């Protein structure tokens, strides 16, 4: 099935990119602009990013917007094909990819080698390792209690444990952990508290500890999913509360964390919940009112915005993957997580490429996201 879709995709890509060009046989070929050379140059970080983006193809730019899951515990041919053909910016691993520490180290090493061979910019290698109910390879990695349980102890204890986890994950080859959870009162003990100030104290300390261990991290799930009444993995949840209520409760956590956290050390993950009094037509991850107008303009967040997994029922039951990808980037997201099905990843990529080619996503909009992503990658020496 994958090969048939791939064949169709390649034909479509050729149709999109074909054209005529005239070449001067006496013209001196410009030296290729490599990521490594630019990073090691004396330019400022912003100048480095501008130079890289100016020399990237649309295909490479669009690939940066995707962080995908792969299948298997080794880097098989299908996974290599996804890296080569879709130029992705990152990989996220799950239990299905993880059997032992040595196996995970080998897999991540092979992923990075394949990315380098394909000429990709260095990859985000991610994991969900919150602790409690959301933990990978539990029997072989440091065991972390649920956030609710951790919050019964000291902030220092939570931070020290997070630093140990970060060091362990970094040693395996990961460079971003999609944690801590910054929501209020989630089920399964995933939240530190129902009190915003308490969540800020714990989530902020845990995030800082991840940074000190050499990992990027992610506050999630903006603007807060503690008031949802449907599991977003299954379907949409409509939350009929006002922006003022959210700013006093769930979203206050994010406002405070943005103020105290070091730029380019973290992402903000946006949820798929719908907040009907703010945007009655779109879930948060597809909402310009929530991402661009509220998070970026009103709250002043200039860093990377990543979506929750787009394979979740809250989106997948209601949109095609091409449409949801385009709408999310238009809304202000930078990275789309598509974690489980290669076909869905391909549909998202093809939808984005088409939107870039026909101007639905402008060059300026595309470049803005790619610049944020590359600036973040450079911040930890990728």
Regions found by a protein language model. Give the residues of each.
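Sec-dependent N-terminal signal peptides of Gram-positive bacterial secreted proteins and lipoproteins
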Residues: 1-26
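N-terminal hydrophobic targeting/anchoring segments and the immediately downstream early-domain regions
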Residues: 21-122, 129-135
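Second-shell residues forming the walls of enzyme active-site clefts
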Residues: 57, 100-116, 194, 198-360, ...
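Hydrophobic faces of well-ordered beta-strands that scaffold small-molecule active sites
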Residues: 63-70, 88-93, 123-129, 176-179, ...
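Short, acidic/polar
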Residues: 71-85, 157-168, 248-256, 319-327
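Active-site beta-loop-alpha junctions enriched in small/polar residues
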Residues: 71-73, 96, 130-132, 181-183, ...
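Glycine-rich, aromatic-flanked loop segments that form ligand/cofactor-binding clefts
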Residues: 112-142, 161-181, 207-224
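A charged helix-plus-loop insertion that forms the helical arch/lid used to bind
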Residues: 141-154
